[in-house]
């Protein structure tokens, strides 16, 4: 099974280890993943089993050589894990991850490449919208889709963490006023239904 593991700063609950695997649920329980507490022994077991080049893949997923398809698959599975959906993504092998900010950034070319990938996943506002507003709108739309599909609102903190994970690689984390903007967009979108 192909598997890549990206280490974040440490193993405390405030920091995360990001996993990409065929089915991470077979390695760790959902509760452990969602709490962000991955014990050192579990990681050692995982690494000794997989025997994969961790450093090389960490560089790849830090923004170097990131293809459009990889970006789409990554975003789909981040949402899959955050919203705790039971269905498996049909677009690729499951890549499941938990995450937190880490300060990695990429250059402008990679930001644009990744942004265009994410935008293909959602119906967007007219082209007059700014890039920032488009990203926020995409987050709001995904939240509304989840509400309609599962009959409950997703945890906004998880939505924000998903966005912040992407932004630590491709830009800057969401500001407080932008978080509120996403919430207001969700309310407006729900009223239109």
Swiss-Prot record:
Primary residence: host cell
UniProt keywords, alphabetically: Early protein, Host cytoplasm, Host nucleus, Host-virus interaction, Phosphoprotein, Virion
PTM summary: Phosphorylated on serine residues in the 115 N-terminal amino acids.
Induction: Expressed in the early phase of the viral replicative cycle.
GO cellular component assignments: host cell cytoplasm; host cell nucleus; virion component
Lineage top rank: taxon: Viruses
Annotated localization: Host cytoplasm; Host nucleus; Virion
Family to which this protein belongs: Belongs to the asfivirus phosphoprotein p30 family.
Complexes and interactors: Oligomer. Interacts with host HNRNPK.
Function, in words: Modifies the subcellular distribution of heterogeneous nuclear ribonucleoprotein K (HNRNPK) and may contribute to modulate HNRNPK functions related to processing and export of mRNAs during ASFV infection. Necessary for virus internalization.
Protein name: Phosphoprotein p30
Organism: African swine fever virus (isolate Pig/Kenya/KEN-50/1950) (ASFV)
């Amino acid at each position: 099974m192909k598997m890549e593991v990206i280490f974040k700063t440490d193993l405390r609950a405030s920091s995360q280890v990001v996993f990409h695997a065929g089915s991470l649920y077979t390695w760790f329980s959902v509760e452990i993943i969602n709490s962000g507490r991955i014990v050192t022994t579990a990681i050692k077991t995982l690494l000794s089993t997989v025997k994969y080049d961790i450093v090389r893949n960490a560089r790849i997923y830090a923004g170097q050589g990131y293809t459009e398809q990889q970006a789409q698959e990554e975003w789909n599975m981040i949402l899959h894990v955050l919203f705790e959906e039971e269905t498996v993504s049909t677009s690729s092998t499951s890549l499941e991850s938990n995450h937190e900010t880490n300060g990695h950034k990429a250059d402008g070319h990679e930001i644009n490449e990744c942004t265009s990938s994410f935008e293909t996943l959602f119906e967007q506002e007219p082209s007059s919208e700014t890039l920032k507003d488009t990203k926020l709108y995409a987050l709001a739309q995904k939240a509304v889709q989840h509400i309609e599909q599962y009959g409950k609102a997703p945890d906004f903190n998880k939505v924000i963490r998903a966005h912040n994970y992407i932004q630590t690689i491709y830009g800057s984390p969401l500001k407080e006023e932008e978080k509120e903007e996403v919430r207001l967009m969700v309310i407006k979108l729900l009223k239109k239904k």
